[in-house]
């Protein structure tokens, strides 16, 4: 995954955004080892070591692909927002895969606020970082949960923020399917109720594909 991440970062041509990514998650950055190892969540999706990297990379790759299809999207801004949208989780969760818990800062401030301030501090260390670009990037971080009910203080108001939010939400939901499928007992087609999905998940199509392979063997 690290190689894929480095390749994606290399495609960000805007110099200030590229410098910011290198400062925060570059190979020599202090934040790289925790970003590489952290879980993406406590329960719902990618709640395991390297889960945050896996999730952010997947969101970044999808954002990159969609940016090439829809006109008007600032690809560099969208990719940077995708890779950094969850960086507050480095401070919000303990980095122990066997016992993922919210930290005091995670409980008192929340991962969105922690991510906002972490990125803003680094932006302030880059001379000449365009203020308008900083506003749009920070807006992606603040709005990526999509609604006030889900914890975002503001709603997505730009193309890039809307794109990151929607792909982030999609990635989380599909990650829930992966988790639920692993929890199925032999012969089960439905998972139990899942809060993230608002119901159960159905997996019969996967079992039907696997059965002929077993018969052929």
Please give the residue ranges for each predicted region.
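Pre-Walker A segment
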Residues: 31-50, 57, 67
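Divalent metal-dependent catalytic cores for phosphoryl transfer on phosphate-bearing substrates
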Residues: 45, 54, 65-183
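Acidic, carboxylate-rich catalytic segments that either coordinate divalent cations
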Residues: 157-217
